[in-house]
Each structure stands twice: as C-alpha cells, then as structure tokens.
Amino acid sequence: MKTKSYKDLEIYNLSFKLAQEIHELSLKFPKFEMYEEGSQIRRSSKSIPSCIAEGWGRRYYKNEFIKFLIYALASCDETKVHLDFIAGCHYITEEQHQHYIERYNVLGMKINKYMQYVMKSYLSPKDKQETDPGIVENPEHYSIEDE
C-alpha cells in the first residue's frame, strides 16, 4: 500500500496512541505535578507524532525529513526519562513503568528502522528528476513584468 499521508505511517499511529495514553495517565498524578512532570511528559510524548507529521510535510527535502525523524526519536528517549522519574516518585506502578518503557523501546526501534529506510532508499523529488520529472514548472510563470 502506498503511503499517502503521515497518518498511514505505523510510527505515527503508534506514537499518537501512546501520547494519548500518557496524557490520560498524567491526569492521575498529584495536583502539584500537573504543571511540572505531568506537563513535561505530556509534551515530550506529543512531540513524537508531531515531529513525524512535520517531517512528512517536509519529505520533499530528504535531509529535513530525516532531521524531524531524529527529533521524534529524541523525544521518544526523553519520554522514557520522564517515565523513569514518575516511576521513581511512585506516581505509576512498576508494572506500568515497564509496560510503557517496553512500548517506547519498540517505538524507538521502529522510528530508527524507518529513518534508515528513508536514508537508504527514499528519493526526494529533486533526486527523482533525472528519471521522473513529475511536474515541471515554467520559471516564466514567476517573472514580474515591468509596467
């Protein structure tokens, strides 16, 4: 199946679902943590699908696409650090901690694999021009005539 949108990407769907779960989980933290650790883990978890979507929007520039996948991977690691903090403060059980750490480990591996795929085989439109010109714009359409 051809990927038509970032919403077709497994890494986007998995990260979005995890971010929703983390959001719900964080609402059960003590009130004084709602704007501290609760806010931090919500932002880092939501950053992952956001970076994947933004990278997809820049997919015509391979290096930009990869950069945003790297940001998503970094946010995945950041979320795991926040999970360690909240487990250490006993806001979640050890079982919950292990459950989410394992799922974020899997997500990180999937993001890394997708990033490797993009690096090795993904051709931006600029790279494709030699074999498939696609839409070719005429620069004359952008010239300004003197009045």
Residue spans for each PLM region:
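Amphipathic alpha-helical assembly/interaction segments
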Residues: 1-147
